[in-house]
A protein has these predicted regions:
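Surface-exposed interaction patch
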Residues: 33, 74-137
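C-terminal, structured domain-capping segment
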Residues: 81-105, 149-201
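Short, polar/proline-rich extracytoplasmic segments that appear immediately after membrane translocation
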Residues: 2-74, 186-188, 195-201
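Compositionally biased, low-complexity repeat tracts
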Residues: 22, 43, 55, 69, ...
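Extracellular adhesion/glycan-binding regions together with long Ser/Thr-
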Residues: 2-4, 65-77, 127-168, 172-173
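Generic preference for hydrophobic/aromatic residues in regular secondary structure cores
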Residues: 50-55, 87-89, 118-120, 171-173
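Intrinsically disordered, low-complexity, compositionally biased regions/tails
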Residues: 20, 51, 63, 77, ...
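Intrinsic-disorder/low-complexity loop/linker signature
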Residues: 48, 59, 73, 93-94, ...
Length: 201
């Protein structure tokens, strides 16, 4: 009788273990066998825009410059007369980037905005922005398409599509020939920035 009970206990134990194994395997299969093929293609869109320059600062610093004509200003070369910079963008996917090249006044300027002219050309020296007094330049507004801060002077706007882009620019700045400079030392600093923002899809 004891032998019979022992056999039943062993049989029940084996059966219990077998049921437990089947249950665990079944639950594991149910938990990990579900899969679904996506029906929507995943796309990653990205874009970057940068500005590079070799000068110590990102702009021009005029100090005690004399007023000159536009013809003379357009022919300026050398340090503190010109600022060479490069705008580069790498755009992938279906992104389009709106960008703007802006300028802001530096600290300690003593020449009025109406007394200074700027002139922007490309790498071939082709005119992009005609000689213009700083106070006549358009200013950025809040929420602009390129994501630039408000109240910066606009030198150039544009759009980049898919691909790699590199544009070289030269900014010239001089004291306008109709500006009457006082006898004291005069200074004007203009710093250049570039901003870019992907177009919302």
């Amino acid at each position: 009788m004891n032998n019979n009970n022992s056999s039943k206990q062993v049989l029940v134990s084996i059966l219990g273990v077998a049921i437990l194994i089947v249950a665990v395997v079944g639950i594991s299969f149910a938990a990990f066998s579900y899969s679904k093929t996506g029906t929507v293609a995943n796309t990653i869109t990205t874009g970057t825009i940068t500005m590079s320059y070799s000068e110590p600062i990102n702009g021009i610093n005029l100090t005690d410059a004399l007023p000159i004509t536009d013809t003379a200003g357009k022919a300026l070369t050398g340090a503190n007369n010109t600022f060479d910079f490069t705008v580069s963008a790498t755009v992938s996917g279906s992104t389009t980037i709106n960008y703007v090249v802006t300028a802001v006044k530096g600290d300690g300027c003593t020449v009025a905005d109406g007394g200074v002219k700027v002139y922007l050309t490309d790498q071939e020296d082709a005119q992009i922005l005609a000689p213009t007094k700083v106070n006549a330049l358009t200013k950025t507004v809040a929420g602009n398409a390129a994501g630039a801060p408000a109240d910066q002077y606009v030198l150039k706007t544009g759009t980049y599509g898919t691909g790699a882009h590199t544009d070289n620019y030269r900014l010239r700045m001089w004291v306008a020939d109709d500006y009457t400079a006082p006898a004291t030392s005069q200074k004007y600093i203009l710093k250049v920035n570039v901003y870019g923002q992907a177009v919302a899809k």
